Each structure stands twice: as structure tokens, then as C-alpha cells.
Amino acid sequence: MPRDYQAEKEKCKTFLQEFYKDDELGKKNFKYGVQLANIAHREQVALYIDLDDLAEEDPELVDAICENTRRYTNLFADAVQELLPQYKEREVVHKDALDVYIEHRLMMEQRGRDPSETRDPHNQYPPELMRRFELYFKAPSSSKARVVRDVKADSIGKLVTVRGIVTRVTEVKPMMVVATYTCDQCGAETYQPIQSPTFMPLIMCPSRECQTNRSGGRLYLQTRGSKFIKFQELKIQEHSDQVPVGNIPRCMSVYVRGENTRLAQPGDHVSITGVFLPMLRTGFRQVVQGLLSETYLESHRLVKMNKTEDDELGTEELSEEELRQITEEDFYEKLAASIAPEIYGHEDVKKALLLLLVGGVDNSPRGMKIRGNINICLMGDPGVAKSQLLSYIDRLAPRSQYTTGRGSSGVGLTAAVMKDPVTGEMTLEGGALVLADQGVCCIDEFDKMMDTDRTAIHEVMEQQTISIAKAGIMTTLNARCSILAAANPAYGRYNPKKTVEQNIQLPAALLSRFDLLWLIQDKPDRDNDLRLAQHITYVHQHSKQPPSQFQPLDMKLMRRYITMCKRKQPAIPESLADYLTAAYVEMRKEARTNKDMTFTSARTLLSILRLSTALARLRLEDVVEKEDVNEAMRLTEMSKDSLLGDKGQTSRTQRPADVIFSTIREMVPEKGARSVKYSEAEQRAVSKGFTPAQFEAALEEYEELNVWLVNQARTKITFV
């Protein structure tokens, strides 16, 4: 059924003038009337029409707009242009060149023209030239955001919302909307509205005077009288969770104009509402591929999803019921066990991965930046579910990138300088680490990477930036991501006869940047192997973890809780400073006496601080407590013990009582009193990974042997 577009325009005018909402005091608030007044006084440029507001008045008009967006954009713009004089109460103070130009032309025309004379159609001002505002539609809330691969031919010309990640951004350039020409013979002005990406400039003057005199006046382009608008091109790609397994992520070009430019950077997750349109190829490409057409999205509204309307994360507050479900007894163990519940065991590794997802607190004292992100390397024999843990973290993390060592080059991880096909300029295209900004980058087969490519990660792991000096582009990109790497030992399997360095064969500069380096060994053990085999066969039969009293948390709920934890900024109180420094000095002392220990540097202390703040965040606290520091030190000890394997000097293989005894003996000063504070000894034992019960048992055992005495108040341990 043909539409009467004049009547439709009247509907648009009525809506803009009459739509209102009641405020708290019951007064009518004319939402669009206020904005029209701002536009008339040049205080606002972009007018967003919210289709939810229009749906209250006229649902049929909303459907028509979604089906034929381009036409209705012009109808609304014409309606606004006609209404503006009613809202203009005063003269515009700050006028630009185009304002003066248009006013001058109108004045000249009124002076020099006979009232009875009709205006030359070529000299008429096109509406695009007179418009000093931009009009965009905001999609109705009922329309769901689509995936790039779901936008197909049936969406041509319609209003669609697409979600994706920005991979490339061009520079903002002025784009010509109306070309103005002046004739060198008669002085008449001619205007040429431009709708397509290319246009043919007019040469001969079409005015009546030149036609009757046959003077053949030539036209010259007047750039000051022409109208330009800001233009930028984006490339968006599907999110990793939207790509079916084994498929290549799809891309889409987005053309952004006016006030919507400069809103996104490479690596931003965005939701873009716009009109899906085709475009014939032009220039040289038309000769080669003349019958092919390209498609693009003409942007109306661009929203960064990781800042405001992040519907993917579901940032609505957790209800009290959900919070109670998470923060009940042993919630730390429960959250850790909810990570990859199909995988048997690895409790401490899962706890470390949970802390990696939450992250520590960033510090920037006087410009110097101390990172808060936690980096973890999982080293282990083949078949211990390292890659499964990585892929689960990739799915669970709100922002993540998954890549493998052999399949990634140094440029693919950091950033590539590409030649823009439209302008021929060099542009930056972010790599995996840039796209994982404020998220997690999982790198599998880390040991298979080329050494030259691996060096690209050094700067990211400590400074959290990527510095580039390529093809005349000198810049620094943010790469504030946690790195989770999985690697096999140098000989395929871990060889206990070799040292740690010989087995790992990664440079010390890289290893010290990992907060935790975890070795997962596959040792034969009858009871363990039996439980693992039963677990695997059950998972294989039923495609889920075996039934138990423990019910793992839903992935969406965990994601929301992690987002909630990240808002906390816990601080370390001064009372813990001495405790931390003493613990660090002790660790350095152990590293010096034990040659087979891994490298311990000042970064180890920073790692403990990061893990402590992550634990405080997990409890939704604003202050780090001693238990957090003890747990952080326990995880650090456990990761070091995992590297020492079956060696005789490892503390794990000795009896707990013997290790606790040697720990307390080391605390006794060489001269003076041969006693130790009970509380300090207990804290030291707990930080080494022992339970209070084991500590008590060790005290009693050695007291019976008459090695030391514990006083009645249990405040002091004195060596006999």
C-alpha cells in the first residue's frame, strides 16, 4: 500500500512538538521541544529520536521507520527544519563561516531579485546545506542486538543493531555533503548535493543567463561555501563467543558521521545501531569486479559496551538471594571449584585462576604504574587438562582472546600497520593483546613460540602497554590484560633428573613476570588414577560432572560476581607492611640457601601484594587482611613446591612436623634469647601452606621430645 509521505511528515512534526513526560512534580517535560530549542540556538548538534518514545504514540510509525530508515531520516530532518524558527527566541552569538555565508547569500538574493520572478532550480538551496543539525534514531528496546553473521540481505535498508569488537579505526576526515560552484561569467551559484562516495564535478554553468547568452561559463568549486561533515570508517568483528567452532570471525564495515565519530578505539566492545546498505564498487576495483557490491552499516548510534550499556555482562546488581548463594560457607573453595567443574582435581590451580579473573588493584603513584593484573603460566605434562582450563577461562572471562604459540606472530599479538584500502594511508590494527585490553589473553603452546615473537610479550606483562614505531607511526597502545599461558616442558614431559631451568627453558626475564608458575605433573598413583578414570568415564557418558554435594555456580552468575568484585579497590593497611617485608626477606634467604629454587626477585613481593588484593576483592572488602596475605603466600609456596617435584629437599615430601620445626628454628636469633613468639611462629607455618592443626601437632610432638617448651599462656616457644 503506497504511503502518503506528506501525512507521515505531519505525524513526525506532531510527535516532536507534543511528546512529553511527567517529572517528579507532575509538570510536563517536553523532551524534544527542549532539544529543538537547543538546536535552534546552536547549543546542540545531534538529535536522537528514541523509538521507544515514538512507540508509545504511534507503533505503526516505528515499524515503518525500522523498515525504511533512510526515507524517514529525511522526513524527520525536514520536520525539524520547519519547526526550528518557532523555537528560535534569540540570535545565535557564535556564528561560523557557513552561517555568515548563507545569511549573506539570502540577503543578496532578496535585494537583487524581482518578487514576481521564479527562482532558478539549479540555484535553489538544497536542504542539506541549510541543516545545521544531525538526526539519528535510537533503536527500540524490543529489538535485540544481532551477531554480524546474522545481518543478511533481508536487512538491507532496515534499522539493525549489531554487537562486535572494533578491530580497525581510520582517521576522521571531512566528507563533502554539498558542493558549491561559482560561474566565472555570470557569477551565479550552483549547488550539487552528493549522496554517493564518488561524484562528477559540474563544469558548465547551468544558469539561465549563461544558457541564453551562450557564454559557456565554467564553474569553479568554492570549498568555503560547500558543506562538509566528519567521516570515519570502523571495522567491527564478531565476539569470540559468537563464532561457531572452526569458523573464521566475520567482519563488517561501519561508516560513522558527525557527532558519532571518535567514540571507539581498536579493542572496544561496541553495540552499533544503523542502516544496513549496499554500495557498488567504484574506481579501479569496478573495472576488475564490476558486478560485485559491498555492504556497510551507516551508523546512527554507537555505544561502548564495556562502559555503559553492557548487556553482555549483565551488570545489574546481584540480588540478596544470589549474594547469599555465593558468599555462604567456604565460598572461596566453592567459587574455585566452579571453574571447569568437569576437570577433576587441580584445586589450587583453580584458586589461582579465580584470582587471575578478579585481578589486583592498579597503582599509579606520580606517573609510575604498578600493574594489578595477575599473570599465570601453567607448565605440565601432556594430558593434564591445561588447554581445557585455558578454554574455560576464555569462555568465563567477560573479555578474552584465545591464541596459540605457533599460530601467532609477534605482530599478531601486538599490533600490525596496515594500508587502508580507501585512503591508502597507514593505519594500526590491534593484535590479540590489544583486543584483550582489560580482559584475559590465553596463549596455548607458549613454549612453541619463536623467541622473537615471545619478546613482544615482555612489555605487555609488566608495563601493560605496547609501544610501536613502524612505518612512521609512533604510538603506545593500552594492553591492560592478564596473560594466562600454557606450556609443555622442554623434553615433552617433565624430567625430574634435570634442574628446573633445564626443564622449563624460558628466559628468566619472562619467568619473573609471571606471578605464579605452576607445574602440573602426571605421576602414577593408584587411588588418584582410579578416581580420575571414574570421573572421566562419567563425564564421557553423561557430558557433565559426576553428582556430588557441591553444586557449581552458573557461569553467568560467576561473571556478574567477578564484575562486582572488580569495582572494589582494597588497600593494604600499614600494620601488614612489617609482616610482608619479613616474609619476603625470609623467601630471599631460602632462595639463597636452596640452589634449586626458582628465581626470587622484588617482583615476587609485588605478586604476593596482587594476590592479596585479589583475595580481598573476592570477599568484597576494602582492606586487605592477614588471612589474605597468608593465602597469597601459600599459593606462591605451592607453585614453587610444584616445580621442585620429587626432590628430597622439597618441603612437601617431608613430614609436616619436621618442616614446621625447621621453620621455627630458623626464626630463632643467633644471639640472645632462644625464644620465639607463638603467634609469629603460627603465621609463618600457615604462610608455608600448613594448617593450624598441623602446627599444633608439631608443637606437641617436639615438646614431648623435650626440644622446646611452650608457656602456659601459649604466647612463647622457648628452645631447651
Curated annotation (Swiss-Prot):
Gene3D superfamilies: 2.20.28.10, mini-chromosome maintenance (MCM) complex, chain A, domain 1, Nucleic acid-binding proteins, P-loop containing nucleotide triphosphate hydrolases. This is DNA replication licensing factor mcm7. ATP 1 binds at Y344, G383, A385, K386, S387, N488. Acts as a component of the mcm2-7 complex (mcm complex) which is the putative replicative helicase essential for 'once per cell cycle' DNA replication initiation and elongation in eukaryotic cells. The active ATPase sites in the mcm2-7 ring are formed through the interaction surfaces of two neighboring subunits such that a critical structure of a conserved arginine finger motif is provided in trans relative to the ATP-binding site of the Walker A box of the adjacent subunit. The six ATPase active sites, however, are likely to contribute differentially to the complex helicase activity. Its main location: nucleus. Ubiquitinated by traip when forks converge following formation of DNA interstrand cross-links. Short ubiquitin chains on mcm7 promote recruitment of DNA glycosylase neil3. If the interstrand cross-link cannot be cleaved by neil3, the ubiquitin chains continue to grow on mcm7, promoting the unloading of the CMG helicase complex by the vcp/p97 ATPase. Early fractionation of eukaryotic MCM proteins yielded a variety of dimeric, trimeric and tetrameric complexes with unclear biological significance. Specifically a MCM467 subcomplex is shown to have in vitro helicase activity which is inhibited by the MCM2 subunit. The MCM2-7 hexamer is the proposed physiological active complex. CDD domains: MCM7 (cd17758). Signal peptide: none annotated. One of its GO terms (cellular component) is CMG complex. It holds the Pfam family HTH_MCM7. Its EC number is 3.6.4.12. It comes from Xenopus tropicalis. ATP 2 binds at R513, R603. GO terms for molecular function: ATP binding; ATP hydrolysis activity; DNA binding; DNA helicase activity; zinc ion binding. Keywords: ATP-binding, Cell cycle, Chromosome, DNA replication, DNA-binding, Helicase, Hydrolase, Metal-binding, Nucleotide-binding, Nucleus, Ubl conjugation, Zinc, Zinc-finger. Residues 331-537 form the MCM domain. It comes from the Eukaryota. A zinc finger (C4-type) spans 183-210. PROSITE patterns: MCM_1, MCM_2. A motif (Arginine finger) lies at residues 512-515.
